[in-house]
Amino acid sequence: MRVTDFSFELPESLIAHYPMPERSSCRLLSLDGPTGALTHGTFTDLLDKLNPGDLLVFNNTRVIPARLFGRKASGGKIEVLVERMLDDKRILAHIRASKAPKPGAELLLGDDERINATMTARHGALFEVEFNDQRSVLDILNSIGHMPLPPYIDRPDEDADRELYQTVYSEKPGAVAAPTAGLHFDEPLLEKLRAKGVEMAFVTLHVGAGTFQPVRVDTIEDHIMHSEYAEVPQDVVDAVLAAKARGNRVIAVGTTSVRSLESAAQAAKNDLIEPFFDDTQIFIYPGFQYKVVDALVTNFHLPESTLIMLVSAFAGYQHTMNAYKAAVEEKYRFFSYGDAMFITYNPQAINERVGE
């Protein structure tokens, strides 16, 4: 399969730079996986699409203000993007500089350059940085960090992004990108879903900056997926197995929830799914056998991204590309602050040939 098979034309004007004034007021394109049929509506239509007893699985990671600006003590501006927090004093990060810092290099971070840190080691493309400060990494980031808006949102971050680029149920700090499908859920909608009898469970996957890295190979089978930490606790496993047992659906909110659930299923030894607390490099593309997820709520993804490949594996390649074509024609808003899709699983997708 070629990466270019997942390309599509997207006018710049359809990339959303700000979210809708109300979280749940975005548009919703529903794709019936088995038939490819499309329905246009608004996000609150989700209420009618879910049945009592269906299980919604959310990712409760919280975005950290992961972008830092500063300079090397020896001179030269730097930009630091945290990939993950290693402990209370250390981070693993991407560093942009005219000349990469060497181990032992002193860094002065923050708009006033008051935070002192040392680059202690390099791991491939990533740098290990230790803060020389009494405060924890999280406190430092909350104090001097900027929200790490995706590269295609072509504007500086604003104070409002600290809440807007965060789900209302976010709980565990550690992500450098929001699980964006969840941005559309507000408290009134969650309340209505609960009142209808829809069950809810929460996994954690700390989305890394690798999610924005382009696929740099021609053949997708050659792509090496970035690693992210995921948690699927026992209560989620119990909720999934109970939903399946009573004939209800497991609906993943976002591709990160999909990757968490399917990672836990892949690693399971004795059951459909078992608890999972580990890094995952799961790469889902056409031909992948889904084991857990029956339906998916997700945003519109970048051309040639691993995420449009995941959706194609779920709904079928042709159905997915047709839906994206329709979304462009109907001027849906794309990417993190854009509109959403509701997709049901196509069991025939696994047999489909791509790019022929």
From Swiss-Prot:
Reaction(s) catalysed by this chain's protein: 7-aminomethyl-7-carbaguanosine(34) in tRNA + S-adenosyl-L-methionine = epoxyqueuosine(34) in tRNA + adenine + L-methionine + 2 H(+)
One of the record's GO molecular function terms: S-adenosylmethionine:tRNA ribosyltransferase-isomerase activity
Pfam annotation, one family: Queuosine_synth
Alphabetical list of InterPro entries matching this protein: QueA, QueA_dom1, QueA_dom2, QueA_sf
SUPFAM superfamilies for this protein: QueA-like
UniProt main location, coarse: cytoplasm
GO CC annotation: cytoplasm
Signal peptide positions (record): none
GO biological process terms on file: queuosine biosynthetic process; tRNA wobble guanine modification
EC number: 2.4.99.17
Superkingdom of this protein's organism: Bacteria
Keywords (A to Z) from UniProt: Cytoplasm, Queuosine biosynthesis, S-adenosyl-L-methionine, Transferase
Compartment(s) of residence: Cytoplasm
Known pathway: tRNA modification; tRNA-queuosine biosynthesis
Subunit structure: Monomer.
Family to which the UniProt record says this protein belongs: Belongs to the QueA family.
General function of this protein: Transfers and isomerizes the ribose moiety from AdoMet to the 7-aminomethyl group of 7-deazaguanine (preQ1-tRNA) to give epoxyqueuosine (oQ-tRNA).
Protein name: S-adenosylmethionine:tRNA ribosyltransferase-isomerase
Top-level taxonomy: Bacteria, Pseudomonadati, Pseudomonadota, Gammaproteobacteria, Enterobacterales
